[in-house]
Swiss-Prot record:
Annotated gene: smg
Domain of life: Bacteria
Organism: Shewanella sp. (strain ANA-3)
InterPro entries in alphabetical order: Smg (IPR007456)
PANTHER family the UniProt entry points to: PROTEIN SMG (PTHR38692:SF1)
Family: Belongs to the Smg family.
Name of this protein: Protein Smg homolog
Pfam families reported for this sequence: DUF494
Length: 158
């Protein structure tokens, strides 16, 4: 499923090619690209749920203290190792993510059918979430820079 998400993001979204609106046509295109029907359905559902997160009420985000600290569940810690969780914290500290977008990222990560995510894959999920979050264009651009720039010697995160 993650491969399909990456394919869609790289070939349609990130390249600024207009994404096919018709789900059947998109499914045919992905099938021609070599993806399996069941994985295509999972990826499209993942994207639909991402869009729904933008529109839904989020009562769990309403009453948070500005200085609160995110405690991860056991399942989240299994999927996001220390490096990934540290990177999420780093992105909050540099204002690329806020509480809302961080929770959207965690929600989307937990829906992936991968047992654990490596940092590079997490970066792409973050980019997808920020791309789909209205009003977060600057954060998207910062995240894009973090993904595509060449790491400098001695840098903590890239």
């Amino acid at each position: 499923m993650f491969d399909i998400l990456m394919y869609l993001f790289e070939n349609y979204v990130h390249s600024e090619v207009e994404l096919l609106v018709d789900e059947d046509e998109l499914t045919k295109e992905l099938t021609r690209a070599g993806f399996h029907q069941s994985e295509i359905l999972k990826a499209l559902t993942w994207l639909e749920r991402l869009a729904e997160l933008q529109e839904s009420d989020k009562p769990y985000l309403c009453n948070h203290d500005q200085h609160s600290f995110r405690i991860y569940t056991k399942e989240e810690m299994e999927k996001l190792d220390v490096e990934c969780r540290g990177f999420l914290l780093f992105l909050e500290q540099v204002k690329v993510l806020n509480v809302e977008t961080r929770e959207m990222v965690i929600d989307r990560v937990m829906e992936l059918d991968e047992p654990a995510l490596i940092l590079e894959d997490l970066k792409w999920v973050i980019l997808m979430v920020l791309f789909n979050a209205p009003g977060h264009e600057s954060a998207y651009e910062q995240m894009e820079d973090l993904i595509f720039e060449q790491p400098e010697e001695g840098r903590l995160h890239s």
